[in-house]
Amino acid sequence: MPENISVSSPLEQLLKKAVRTQGGKFPRRNGTYFDHYTSIKQRLADKYYAVTGAALAQTGDRYTKHDISHVDDVIETAGLMLGFGHDSHNPAYKNLEPYEVFALLLAILLHDAGNAIRRQGHEKKAAEILREVATATGLNDLEHRIISSIAQAHGGEMPDGSKDTITALMKDPEPNIGKIKIHARRLAALVRLADELSENYTRADEVAIEAPGTPDVSLLANYYCLLINPRIDFVGKSVHLAFHVDVKLLPRVFKIPKGDGQTEDIMFIDYIAQRLEKCERERRYCNRFLAGFASFDRIRAKLVIVDNNREIDTVPVDLEEVGYPSLSKTVKELEPNFDACRLRNKHSLTAEQEQGQ
């Protein structure tokens, strides 16, 4: 039986309107891009996202939900990051080209579909899956490469271990399809940060939380989703993350695997702190590509400790760039030839050489 899908989000409705009123701004002017998008979403929901839970459970873990509802959450979050739902005179979505809306939405649809095959390296399956689900759409090879790269860049590592997937996968930051320019790195950053900020209570697997034998690493991820309350402030350029934690959870110790096959102990508040640090790194990374368009200046997090439905303590923290900045590499480390002695030896005569002339 087909999965129920919705295409009613503001971002999806923006695509529908653009196809109807600005058909000339798409590679093909046949007005079918929204229909193609809808059919691809249905296909992905039925064949891939309907089985991600079972596929992920094969390793024994109980991950947070990766079904089509998570895809809709990422679409909703991306819309909020672009200014939908905010009282702004200059929302970022107005600066998107019509075809960019299509590429962004399609990349979001693809970003987690590979989990139906295997969690490790799932992002690398984007191109293969797009080929399979978009056979009847007429997308050309260049469209396939651009859109699948945007989807793939939402996570993972490059072969050299680098997490800078956006730069590595999109050598050309603004490729074009004919006369249509696509801000590929910008779109990839939107997908990546929207995915990071789409944790919410609907992703939590409460059966896994209550079931005996659920691995602690899965419990932590599900508790995190269950207790987080996110809010995107487009006008204030801030991300707000509140965590309402029951006092009974504070002393509990969880055992999580380490890379050497051993385990280490961690408490839930410390796990939240680690996740916040990762979220802040993602914000700073994605801001490189979102600057001047839809960047965010800070994450404002807050712990609310609850006992018998009564708030007994609040701990706020702001994550943002403060103080005088440092450089990870010097100019000479970035470019060894930016060196006085090297350039002198390469282009200038020594005193002895001048005397010999």
Q: Where would I find each of the regions flagged by the language model?
A:
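C-terminal effector/catalytic modules and regulatory tails appended to multi-domain proteins
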Residues: 2-22, 37-41, 211-357
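Generic detection of long, well-ordered alpha-helical segments
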Residues: 68-72, 141, 187, 269, ...
